[in-house]
Amino acid sequence: MHRLTLLAALLCPALATAANCSLPTTLDQRQFTNLSDPLYAPDNPNAGRMVQVSFAGSQYVLDILGTDLRIGGSYHYQRLTLHTAEIQMTEAHPAGPTHYTLLLTCLSDHQGRFIYTQHDGPIAPRQRQNSGRWTLQP
């Protein structure tokens, strides 16, 4: 959790002041395409993975592109500032529940960066962080 705070403090102010953008007030009926940073590290087993996330009400469906894997879950979205937001997610992964947070910053109204923090989950390491890019579909 301390790494999330440190990364947010380092990344968000620079991105927020450099961009004239805003994050949506709600994710209901919206869809993201996310690409994790491609550099492999032992604490980033999903490096380079692209997913599509569809939100409806308090539920989401995550499709791991290039695979047949589709995972559902619940989420809570909160826009923290015009340029930053947090999504708390609980995923119903086939190997067991995964709890994670996405911290979003925008570069434009439809694109930005995210920091993924897994608090607990079935895929080792159980706690980890990585980052990537998000694109909000029109």
What are the functions of these language-model segments?
Residues 26-33, 57-61, 82-89, 111-113:
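Short, hydrophobic/aromatic-rich segments at coil-to-beta transitions
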